[in-house]
């Protein structure tokens, strides 16, 4: 059996259906907990289509936000949504940020760190560009604990012998791994929190379009007609619907924050 192809986020519209609602729910909880105050300078590392940056703009009136992502398609999608003058959208690598050291008050990776091939390098870069005393923070879906929104899909694909792609650095989603990394980097005043969210789909067709057809793994295109029908049956059996046909799925993320030594 060949390994699944790496996850790539190249379709901004599909990402909006697939992950943006989840991202906004988790991001709102994360920002309430982060509580950095208004008027700060931010870097949003792995900004995707700008969903988290939009939350920052709405909640904390930042003086500036540098939002960076490796996908030109995602950044283009963000440009279509975000026109705020204090936002700078760029294409770039989380492991080699194009910013001066000690520049930002707040550095965040929102649902990104487990996609970084070398999480330590990514976190080190966030720390480097953060001002002394500034906040360095991250949250990721708890992949190892079954908390990612795609878990029902992953489980059924695994059972069919068609494993879906996983984030390359899934181990960093564990609280123990996050705390060890932040401690190893010398980040102070470290705190952690679990973020629990849910999403309700109008019916199974809504779930299928949002979480399967729109998946960045391109799952449906890799299955035969019979396999697609089997996957639908498995997911319908697994996901209970309400009397109205609505389906509610739960997910949870591991979050960490701390401050750069002054």
In which residue ranges do the predicted regions lie?
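Conserved class I S-adenosyl-L-methionine
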Residues: 135-163
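Conserved Class I S-adenosyl-L-methionine
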Residues: 3-8, 49-51, 170-262
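Conserved alpha-helix/loop element of class I SAM-dependent methyltransferases that forms part
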Residues: 21-40, 55
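Class I SAM-dependent methyltransferase Rossmann-like catalytic core
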Residues: 9-21
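A short SAM/SAH-binding and catalytic strip from SAM-dependent methyltransferases
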Residues: 105-119, 142
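A short acidic, Gly/Pro-enriched loop at the edge of an enzyme's catalytic core
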Residues: 95-107
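A short glycine-rich, Lys/Arg-flanked "PGG" loop and its adjoining helix->strand segment in the class I
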Residues: 120-135
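Class I SAM-dependent methyltransferase SAM/SAH-binding core
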Residues: 41-97, 121
């Amino acid at each position: 059996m060949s390994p699944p192809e790496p996850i790539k986020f190249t379709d901004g519209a599909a990402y909006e259906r697939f992950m943006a609602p989840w991202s906004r729910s988790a991001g709102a909880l994360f920002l309430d907990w982060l509580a950095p105050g208004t008027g700060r300078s931010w870097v949003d590392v792995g900004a995707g289509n700008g969903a988290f940056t939009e939350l920052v703009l709405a909640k904390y009136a930042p003086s500036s936000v540098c939002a960076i992502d490796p996908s030109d398609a995602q950044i283009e999608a963000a440009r279509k949504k975000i026109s705020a003058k204090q936002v700078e959208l760029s294409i770039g690598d989380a492991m080699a940020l194009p910013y001066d050291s000690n520049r930002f008050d707040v550095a965040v990776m929102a649902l990104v760190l487990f996609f970084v091939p070398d999480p330590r390098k990514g976190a080190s870069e966030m720390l480097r560009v953060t001002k002394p005393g500034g906040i360095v923070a991250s949250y990721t879906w708890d992949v190892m604990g079954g908390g990612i929104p795609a878990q029902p899909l992953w489980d059924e694909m695994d059972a069919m012998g068609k494993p879906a792609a996983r984030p390359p650095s899934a181990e960093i989603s564990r609280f123990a791994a996050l705390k060890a990394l932040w401690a190893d980097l010398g980040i102070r005043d470290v705190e952690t929190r679990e973020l629990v969210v849910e999403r309700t789909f109008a019916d199974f067709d809504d779930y299928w379009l949002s979480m399967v057809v729109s998946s960045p793994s391109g799952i449906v295109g890799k299955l035969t007609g019979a396999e697609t029908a089997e996957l639908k049956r498995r997911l319908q059996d697994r996901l209970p619907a309400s009397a109205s046909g609505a389906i509610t799925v739960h997910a949870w993320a591991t979050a960490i924050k701390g401050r750069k030594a002054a």
